Amino acid sequence: MNPRSPFSIAILLTLPVVLLSACWQRGSRTPAEAKARLAAAVAARDPSRLWNALDLDTQWSWMTALRAGREAYDITLSNLPEGQLRERMIRRFQPAATSENAAELFAKSLAVDLWPSLAGQIAAASDRAPTQNAAGSEAEIVWPAGRLLFRKASQSAFGWGFAGLAAEAEALKRTASADLEALRTNAADYERAAARGSR
């Protein structure tokens, strides 16, 4: 067996470090780092950086909404007859259908007043560090008028993220999923009606 070259040994020694760094690209190592990441995104008013600052559950909700919206758009085009309802549904699902990924859909959907709202929360939190709960799954900074909430993903590789937009994302996911189920039912009804009409 040929002995390993110094070059190959160096690669093997550095590979775990590279893999570890890649794992931490989603989420932050600590709640304090997650807060800093959020603050930087808000200061820059950068939707992409804000997306990367979110906790994993919030991102998953947007990913689910994206998938549901795309399928709903396809069903609308394929099955709904011409008319006002079809046009309304096309407009409703078009943002998801034309988004390359969930981050882009998130960016399209940001309310204008979100940036000043988040900036105000970060200013109110000042330089205080987030306090973790006993389970180590959440951390928060609380003041009389509000709080900043951070969550750690159950998958250790994904780290901490800002969870202050989680409730809105969950509501969006539920609505998108309900819309999709309703459209699936309607599409089946249209198909049965068309089949009867062709007899």
Please place each PLM-identified region on the residue numbering.
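C-terminal motif of bacterial Sec signal peptides marking the signal peptidase cleavage site
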Residues: 20-22
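Short beta-strand edge/turn micro-motifs at domain boundaries
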Residues: 104, 113-123, 129, 136-192
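Amphipathic alpha-helical repeat elements characteristic of tetratricopeptide repeat
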Residues: 28-32, 44, 177, 184
